[in-house]
Regions:
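Non-catalytic accessory regions of SAM-dependent methyltransferases
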Residues: 1-57, 65
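Conserved RecA-like P-loop NTPase ATPase core
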Residues: 45, 172, 202, 217, ...
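Conserved beta-strand segments of alpha/beta enzyme cores
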Residues: 99, 154, 179-181, 275-278
């Protein structure tokens, strides 16, 4: 990162643009991303450090220079240059129209998971007092989105990680969602003997040793939230096989899964005795969420 310009230069035309270009170029080169994408990220870091909006950075060059000279900006830019995901650097990520607190203790919410929420919402009427279980809640993005949009539902969210549960509870408070009970435990451990109208989960589904784990954002995310045994199906087997006794009659199980796993997951649901098994595809036409119903 080049040195900030002197005070006499702060108000010169194009000063803010020069700052943006210099840091954007460095970020694009380090992360092999497009210049427009790098520019957007630099603007986000500057607005956070300077506590100003993006328009002000361009309209008032001195504000851009001031933000750029802060220790907060230098630290966050260095973290991003190392490849750390923006969600962790900024401490937040938008999901389903809501901004969630994010920490390295939780998986970063992804657009594919919004498909899971959409399918769940279709099965929950706005006035329904249905019982819902979110297994492996992580940041709580699924449970909180459902709780926000279906306030009559009664939701239980579980996770093995105390740190993840703390983030999830914080997100529920942030969005004023009060119809979620959070419990610590592995999968159904914390809800022994209970039944639910809907069970949702975005479990780990990456095979241990997958080459993608040492690339991009995955390098920084918690392995326990990503990997599930040598074939990626360890968690899926555990959830699907144990789900039927925890479903009410007519209740549904919805699970997110990886690229190319759709048919195998559908077969798991059928083998567990679930019926009306369907898949929801992403924008590329790839099955990413599979659902089944207890007869």
């Amino acid at each position: 990162m080049s040195a900030a310009p002197g005070a006499d230069h702060l108000s010169a035309p194009g000063a803010a643009e020069q700052l943006l270009r210099a840091d954007s170029s460095a970020l694009a080169s380090a992360l092999h991303i497009s210049l427009p994408e790098a520019r957007r990220e630099v603007q986000m870091l500057l607005t956070r450090a300077g506590q100003v909006d993006a328009a002000s950075l361009l309209a008032y060059p001195e504000r851009a220079a001031q933000a750029r000279s802060t220790a907060a900006y230098a630290q966050t830019l260095a973290r991003r240059l190392s490849g750390e995901p923006m969600a962790y650097v900024l401490g937040e990520r938008e999901f389903f129209g809501l901004v969630f607190e994010i920490s390295p203790a939780v998986l970063i919410p992804r657009p594919e998971t919004e498909l899971l929420v959409e399918l769940a919402l279709e099965r929950l009427t706005a006035q329904s007092a249905a019982t819902v279980l979110d297994l492996g809640t992580g940041s709580g993005c699924i449970a909180v989105a459902l709780g926000k949009l279906r306030p009559a539902a009664r939701i239980v969210a579980t996770d093995l990680s105390p740190d993840a549960l703390e983030v999830a509870r914080s997100n529920a408070r942030r969005h004023g969602v009060t119809n979620i009970a959070f419990h610590a435990g592995s999968w159904f451990e914390a809800v022994a003997g209970e039944r639910f109208d809907l069970i949702v989960s975005n479990p780990p589904y990456v095979a241990r040793g997958d080459a993608h784990l040492v690339q991009g954002d995955l390098r920084f995310e918690p392995a326990v939230a990503l990997t599930a045994g040598p074939d990626g199906f360890e968690a899926m087997h555990a959830i699907v096989s144990a789900a039927p006794p925890h479903l009410t009659r007519g209740g549904s199980l919805l699970v997110e899964h990886g690229h190319g796993q759709g048919e195998a997951v559908a077969q798991l649901l059928r083998s567990a005795g679930l019926v009306d098994v369907i898949a929801r595809n992403d924008l590329a036409g790839i099955a990413r969420v599979t659902a089944g119903r207890r007869p």
